Every structure is written in C-alpha cells, then in structure tokens.
Amino acid sequence: MFAWLMGLKSISPAGLHRLMQDKPVTAIDVNSRQSWVQARVPGALNLDPAGYDEKNLPADKDSLLVFYCSNPLCRKAPNAARRAKQMGYGNVHVMSAGITGWLNAKLPTESGE
C-alpha cells in the first residue's frame, strides 16, 4: 500500500519468487537482524533501512532491487526503496506483503547467520 502511494513498483511474494527463478534479483530485508536470522527470502541481504548507502548495494544501477519488511503496514521497505531510487537505482520494487506474506504463501526461506 505505502509503496504505491510513494510511486514505487510493488511485487507479490509469488511474483518475486518467479523472478528469482529467471534473473538475478537482490532481495533486501529491512527487518531487524533477529527477524532476518529467523526467516528470510533466500539470498536476501539484511540492511538498516535508514543507515545503508551505495556500498551496500550492487554497483550496477540497473540491478533489480526488491525491498521488504514485515507486513503490508510496515513503512520501512518503501522508505528504503525510495532512498535507493534517490541514489539512482532505476529497477526498484517493494514486496509490500513483507516476510509475513512470503511465509503465508509457503515459499522457501533461509534462516541462520
């Protein structure tokens, strides 16, 4: 919801999962480190939504970035995605359903450090 209001592209958990089968995707979890350790989208980075910079992201500004947080009411992912757009990244999406939506869709996860 917040992604759309901020003019960002939104993607569903199933849509992200399909994309991950076909092309390189940088999934970015902006939840707490503890939450990231418990369950995350496979291969997802864990970044502080307010404290990351370009060195934490791929060098290629055309890379596909997908930000997510906990659930549709969370504003951290849209805010972090907007920040990436301001840094010049053009292919930025938000998985608005968050990790909750990913888990509810019974999609594969990773856990641990």
PLM regions and their residue ranges:
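Catalytic cysteine-centered active loop of the rhodanese-like fold, especially the PTP/DSP P-loop
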Residues: 59-103
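Conserved beta-strand scaffold positions in the cores of enzyme catalytic domains, especially
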Residues: 10, 27, 44-46, 92-94
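Short, hinge-like loop/turn segments at secondary-structure boundaries
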Residues: 45-46, 63, 109-113
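Short amphipathic alpha-helix with an adjacent loop that forms part of the alpha/beta core around
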Residues: 18, 53-62
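Glycine-rich, highly charged phosphate/nucleotide-binding loops
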Residues: 47-53
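Short helix-loop-beta junction
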Residues: 41-43, 88-89
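Flexible, polar/low-complexity N-terminal or interdomain linker segments that lie immediately upstream
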Residues: 1-38, 111-113
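Short loop/helix-cap segments at secondary-structure boundaries that form the rim of catalytic
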Residues: 36-42, 57-59, 102
